[in-house]
């Protein structure tokens, strides 16, 4: 399989808002999409890493009609890895024993790490609601910004590791719930036509959205907030969407 990893984007620097990045990168990704559409085979797989990754991936999706929508994904594995690591520390358990962690929505501070369906060593995780909402969720959401605050730069090594994990899942499949940004089609009442992180089953032959997950009510509200953010981002770049 041929892969294109879209790492390059105007970087987010200290004090910069995500909204500042959107239009700066939209034109870049449209021009890259046009070249990709012209020269790449239809089964090429494209992973968008450069932020705002979901909306950059949306621009690629709209401007590469020769490539399957399912082959264009945005990186959410970094958030997935962070969420598992934070829960691992809390429970003093190995990361590999944590299953069914979900990340919903955008790769931004509105992302929704959801551990209400998590299992550790085949047992349902049962943690205090206050810790989940006051500590766990904000810690995952803000981790990228914290690293920029400390280093003045984003987390390159962690992102590289997450890209490797993302490709490994696409190539070899996974026995766990995966978090990948894909083009939404109305699942869980999410607006169609957004690049949205959804819970997936992934095999070496493809992926499918896991249906009928019971979403805790407070998580559902957060998912709607992330959806709203992605709709606003889509509106900002609508001139780049044919």
Regions found by a protein language model. Give the residues of each.
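Surface-exposed alpha-helical segments enriched in charged/polar residues
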Residues: 6, 34-38, 168
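NAD(P)H-binding glycine-rich loop region in Rossmannoid oxidoreductase-like domains
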Residues: 1-22
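Short hydrophobic/aromatic-rich motifs at helix boundaries and adjacent loops
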Residues: 5-7, 28-31, 55-59, 135-140, ...
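Conserved residues at the C-terminal ends of beta-strands
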Residues: 7, 75, 104
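Structured loop/turn residues at beta-strand edges in well-structured enzyme cores
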Residues: 1, 42, 96
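Gly/Ser/Thr-rich beta-alpha loop segments that engage phosphate groups in nucleotides
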Residues: 10-11, 52, 107
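C-terminal substrate-binding/catalytic lobe of Rossmann-fold NAD(P)-dependent dehydrogenases
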Residues: 64-70, 79-242
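Rossmann-like NAD(P)(H) cofactor-binding subdomain of soluble oxidoreductases
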Residues: 17-85
């Amino acid at each position: 399989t041929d892969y294109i990893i879209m790492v390059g984007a105007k970087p987010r620097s200290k004090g910069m808002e995500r909204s500042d990045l959107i239009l700066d990168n939209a034109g870049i990704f449209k021009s890259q999409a046009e070249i990709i559409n012209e020269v790449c085979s239809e089964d090429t797989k494209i992973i968008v890493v450069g932020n705002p990754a979901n909306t950059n991936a949306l621009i690629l999706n709209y401007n590469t009609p020769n490539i399957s929508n399912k082959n264009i994904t945005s990186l959410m594995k970094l958030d997935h890895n962070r969420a598992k690591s934070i829960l691992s520390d809390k429970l003093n358990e190995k990361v590999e024993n944590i299953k069914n962690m979900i990340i919903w929505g955008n790769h931004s501070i509105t992302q929704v790490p959801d551990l209400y369906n998590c299992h550790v060593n085949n047992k349902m995780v049962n943690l205090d609601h206050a810790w989940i909402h006051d500590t766990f969720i904000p810690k995952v959401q803000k981790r990228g910004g914290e690293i920029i605050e400390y280093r003045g730069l984003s987390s390159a090594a962690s992102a590289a590791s997450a890209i490797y994990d993302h490709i490994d899942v696409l190539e070899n499949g996974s026995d766990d719930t995966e978090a990948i940004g894909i083009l939404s089609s109305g699942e869980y009442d999410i607006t169609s036509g957004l690049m949205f992180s959804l819970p997936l089953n992934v095999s070496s032959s493809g992926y499918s959205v896991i249906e009928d997950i019971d979403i805790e009510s407070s998580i559902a509200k957060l998912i709607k907030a992330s959806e709203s953010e992605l709709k606003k981002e889509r509106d900002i770049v609508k001139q780049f969407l044919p």
